[in-house]
Amino acid sequence: MTVISTNKDPENLRLTLVAEFDSTPERVWAVWEDPRKLEQWWGPPTWPATFTRHDFVVGGESRYQLTGPNGEVHRGYWRMHAIDKPVRIDFANGLAGADGEPTPELPPVTGYATFEAISSGTRMTAVIQFLDLAQMEMMIGMGMAEGMTQAIGQIDALLTSAPE
């Protein structure tokens, strides 16, 4: 089923995407935990991700780059704030410079993903919390909601193709 709802909430400075998968929470969790699986869905289909670092522990950091269809590169990072396997991940997600390190010009957004067992498999809820309305409008204007929807839309195929 993949993404079943997207909610842009400027009053609370949040973007929420809800997706459902015909798989267990543990298997959906694994597509976040394993960097090689993460590379197969983080980023829209025409902007594949490469994770050069993925320290998936509380306080750990990840570094990644998205490569566009014309070879353009955008870098980003995560900082893990809390991990409750296989229930919830809390993290900061920000832009990085050419060296892969966080850029101070644009503060990171915070976010979390939850994984809930339901009768048909797993409901994953991804929430991005913006610092202010200007940041939210800028990132939504850059296509963040559509990009996340396309990215999450790739998880179904990954779960189907991966062995149990």
Provide a role label for each language-model segment:
Residues 92, 99-146:
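Beta-strand/loop substructures that line and gate deep hydrophobic ligand-binding cavities in soluble
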Residues 25-26, 56-57, 81-88, 114-123:
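A short, structured loop/turn motif at beta-sheet edges
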Residues 16, 36-75:
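Short beta-edge strand/loop motif at the mouth of beta-sheet-based domains
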Residues 17-19, 51-54, 76-82, 108-117:
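Hydrophobic/aromatic beta-strand elements that line small-molecule binding cavities or substrate pockets
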Residues 28, 38, 62-64, 80, ...:
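Hydrophobic pocket/interface hotspot
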Residues 24, 69-71, 83-85, 96-98, ...:
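Short coil/turn motifs at secondary-structure junctions
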Residues 1-48:
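Hydrophobic ligand-binding cavity/cleft-lining segments
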Residues 51, 159-164:
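Short, highly charged C-terminal tails/helix-capping segments
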